[in-house]
Amino acid sequence: MESPIERFRLSQTAKDSLIKLKRYTKIDQWNILCRWAFCRSLAEPSLPSPVPIPADSNVELSWKVFGGEMADIFLIALKQRCHQDGLGTDKETLTQQFRLHLHRGIGYLAGDAKLS
């Protein structure tokens, strides 16, 4: 399945949070932590706040690296969540919602007292 999201860059705030998470969890790969964060946000019933998220860090991942062999499953989960939230599943909406869920999830993980 072809993803509408080819590459994405994290915000500096998200990068800093992931560095902290890497230290606490001993998980070295950005993509693994990003997968956890994305799923954590999808599990939250509320919509992520539609705030602008800067792409101001030097951490950039391709969709294939992010998703690995589960990339199609992550895309289906994103489309299902957009449908559930009454949003479209066009490229722009999917890209925006992915960024919002990813960054919200990183914030949730970084603030989880069980992980620090």
Regions found by a protein language model. Give the residues of each.
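Surface-exposed, Lys/Arg-rich phosphate-binding patches that contact polyanionic backbones
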Residues: 4, 11-32, 36, 60, ...
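Short, basic amphipathic alpha-helical segments that act as recognition/interaction helices
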Residues: 28-53, 110, 114
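Non-catalytic, well-ordered alpha-helical scaffold segments
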Residues: 31-35, 72, 96, 100
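Short, positively charged interaction helices/loops
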Residues: 43-85
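Low-complexity intrinsically disordered segments
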Residues: 84-116
